Amino acid sequence: MSSEKLFRIQCGYQNYDWGKIGSSSAVAQFVHNSDPSITIDETKPYAELWMGTHPSVPSKAIDLNNQTLRDLVTAKPQEYLGESIITKFGSSKELPFLFKVLSIEKVLSIQAHPDKKLGAQLHAADPKNYPDDNHKPEMAIAVTDFEGFCGFKPLDQLAKTLATVPELNEIIGQELVDEFISGIKLPAEVGSQDDVNNRKLLQKVFGKLMNTDDDVIKQQTAKLLERTDREPQVFKDIDSRLPELIQRLNKQFPNDIGLFCGCLLLNHVGLNKGEAMFLQAKDPHAYISGDIIECMAASDNVVRAGFTPKFKDVKNLVEMLTYSYESVEKQKMPLQEFPRSKGDAVKSVLYDPPIAEFSVLQTIFDKSKGGKQVIEGLNGPSIVIATNGKGTIQITGDDSTKQKIDTGYVFFVAPGSSIELTADSANQDQDFTTYRAFVEA
């Protein structure tokens, strides 16, 4: 039975055209399993499931008169947020994070998000395109195998790409290519003068690319596609996956600048199930394919670069980026033990990005063993979703609050509430897996 400390929420979803189609989408599977009265249209994309207090796509408390989570929080902020969270984040109406599931069939826009200072400046100058004054750090956790772009490639790889791919060389110009290749200094300690100069050179290259006329991009795209067909070996020493990737993304966004700034300049990241990456403010990134759990600060501020028909703010984009140039492996997040979670789970690990708004706890039970896990009360609100398997969830020691939790079910947990997860080991063909987004202060 629901209580005001633990209750199930029905979450809204988005049918953006980049989403996976029909029941191939994890979002669609979760939506239907959570509410079988919702029929999945096998011709429509199901892109995002939103879990939180965002007014655009509200989550509703099923057993509390279908009130929105935002209305519940607004009515009783001390109970649902806690005084420390209200004080720290300055809002008594909303969670400081938005929790999502994304199912990606087609590439999303290459984008970056401002930090808090720039977010406030952009909002003041252009509230139409920048609707709030917050930053928007994000974390992506793979639910199925995932690929994306994240941050600029290491500079030695970029130098090799500029020297090897004639079409990119043609766009940037030989003079700037030579300046970049001869000017970068490696290794360079972060913050050193060599590092500062390296970033300035990278900014010049990226700025030149992003300010190239569309006609030139179209001409060079035709040549680049021909090269991926006739001379795929050209890309062997850079990344042997590039010919297929360029052709695939060109079918989705023909003649797009993203083929150059994404495929050739950014890290192509693959995540296996359970792996994660943190997307820092002012670093370029894009999601290409797969199903992910995503958590972000509550903001809609996006500065776009490519693979989009939407507004591209090239001037601010080129000026704002950090121009960090780390390897793929450094983009991935390390996992941490979570000592406040104890019991029979084979895995209970923390994804803890270097920002205040959110962390995510993953808990997995072996399908053949079942068992019970107790997670101590947290000093802030949280949202739990089951992505595989089934079991029960309850307030620790209070059997009257015990409820079924199945794949796609989502629950809100009030601050300070210790919860108990129990895996259903009978006829379970999947490991019972939950993700829990939370904030503490």
Curated annotation (Swiss-Prot):
Its cofactor is Zn(2+). It is found in: Cytoplasm. The keyword Cell membrane does not apply. Zn(2+) binds at Q111, H113, E138, H285. GO terms for molecular function: mannose-6-phosphate isomerase activity; zinc ion binding. Binds 1 zinc ion per subunit. Its main location: cytoplasm. It catalyses: D-mannose 6-phosphate = D-fructose 6-phosphate. InterPro entries: Man6P_Isoase-1, Mannose-6-P_Isomerase, Pmannose_isomerase-type1_CS, PMI_typeI_C, PMI_typeI_cat, PMI_typeI_hel, RmlC-like_jellyroll, RmlC_Cupin_sf. The active site is at R304. CDD domains: cupin_PMI_type_I_N (cd07011). NCBIfam families: manA. Involved in the synthesis of the GDP-mannose and dolichol-phosphate-mannose required for a number of critical mannosyl transfer reactions. Monomer. This is Mannose-6-phosphate isomerase. It comes from Candida albicans (strain SC5314 / ATCC MYA-2876) (Yeast). The gene is PMI1.
